[in-house]
């Protein structure tokens, strides 16, 4: 009878040691999961304040006819978010990237802050539009670093071209 009690005690101590080791591993892994979830939450919270919108009348987008002069299309994009946007972007006109693009920011001229406009003048010899043509614009831009992350913002707009 004495042997049964000692072996039961040894089994109890062994089970407690094993369960203690397992719980330590589980707590460590749970801590890693919690940190990853916190990082993802912080990253996604910053993306909520990043957005851009078309500025102006989509039925009156100015362009210059190549037959008359330079083939330029001028588009205004508003930083409608709460974070500063980078001037790194891509603009597609009917799915094609223009050969040359120049930009300016109003009113600052340098930083694309919330509420500021990015003026994009796109030109390409392959742009052959006439007054009243419709064009599909797609814009994607990135934010400056927000809590250590950069976020993208997109704009898709159907516009009507108006010869200047």
Regions found by a protein language model. Give the residues of each.
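N-terminal export/assembly leader peptides and their processing motifs that target proteins to secretory
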Residues: 28-164
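Membrane-helix interfacial "entry" motifs
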Residues: 1-4, 8
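C-terminal juxtamembrane segment of a hydrophobic transmembrane alpha-helix
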Residues: 9-38
């Amino acid at each position: 009878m004495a042997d049964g009690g000692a072996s039961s005690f040894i089994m109890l101590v062994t089970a407690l040691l094993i369960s203690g080791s397992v719980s330590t591993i589980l707590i460590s892994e749970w801590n890693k999961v919690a940190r990853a979830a916190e990082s993802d939450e912080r990253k996604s919270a910053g993306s909520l304040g990043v957005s851009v919108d078309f500025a102006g009348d989509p039925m009156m987008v100015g362009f210059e006819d190549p037959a008359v002069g330079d083939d330029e299309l001028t588009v205004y994009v508003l930083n409608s978010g709460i974070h500063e946007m980078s001037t790194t972007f891509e603009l597609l006109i009917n799915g094609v990237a223009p050969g040359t693009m120049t930009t300016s920011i109003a009113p600052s001229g340098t930083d694309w802050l919330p509420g500021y406009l990015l003026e994009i003048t796109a030109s390409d010899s392959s742009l052959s539009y006439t007054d009243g043509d419709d064009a599909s614009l797609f814009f994607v831009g990135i934010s400056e670093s927000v809590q250590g992350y950069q976020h993208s913002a997109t704009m898709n707009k159907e516009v009507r071209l108006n010869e200047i």
